[in-house]
A protein has these predicted regions:
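ER/Golgi luminal nucleotide-sugar-dependent glycosyltransferases, focusing on the catalytic module
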Residues: 1-168
Length: 168
């Protein structure tokens, strides 16, 4: 079964750089709305892992999952305090979050089944189509379309957008 890993920082550090939204209440509302979206998207089920690295209480999200859940969409939660300094940037913290999630939920992750990492506040409107049409036996599935200056041709930029990325 496919796994959706929804990453979150509900209450970001006051010194976190480059945040467009820092209010925990607003962020929590967006995380809740996105979680409900993934719980109610039509089609076959998937396992949802919701992982927050700001040690924020997840009662609101647990309640949303209980009220909108399906038997074929189990949801598992983890909230912990990140040890990565905010000054190191969002990317470094997110990599640590992914590592923590994969380690913590290792028993729930079927071997060689894809994990779709999604920024937890975002609703990927075509997630069902992406999951249903993913290439067989892929290792990494990422979006390079909307990232400017990718590759050696343009100054060696090898960045990709990691709001949605899948891996096995």
């Amino acid at each position: 079964m496919t796994t959706l890993l929804l990453t979150a920082t509900i209450a970001p550090s006051h010194d976190a750089p480059q945040l467009s939204l820092s209010d925990p209440a607003e962020r929590l509302s967006q995380y809740r709305d996105a979680l409900v979206y993934y719980l109610t998207t039509p089609g076959p089920g998937w396992t949802i892992l919701f992982v927050d690295n700001s040690s924020y209480p997840l009662d609101t999200l647990r309640s949303a999952a209980k009220n909108n859940g399906r038997e074929d969409r189990p949801v598992h939660f983890l909230s912990y305090a990140s040890e990565v300094p905010a000054a190191w940037g969002k990317g470094r913290g997110e990599v640590a979050l992914i590592e923590k999630a994969l380690d913590h939920f290792a028993d729930l992750l079927p071997r060689d089944e894809p994990v779709w990492k999604i920024t937890g506040r975002h609703k990927v409107r075509n997630i069902r189509r992406l999951v249903d049409t993913q290439p067989p036996d892929f290792k990494v599935y990422a979006d390079f379309r909307s990232v400017p200056l990718v590759g050696n041709r343009f100054f060696g930029n090898h960045w990709t957008d990691t709001q949605v990325i899948a891996f096995t």
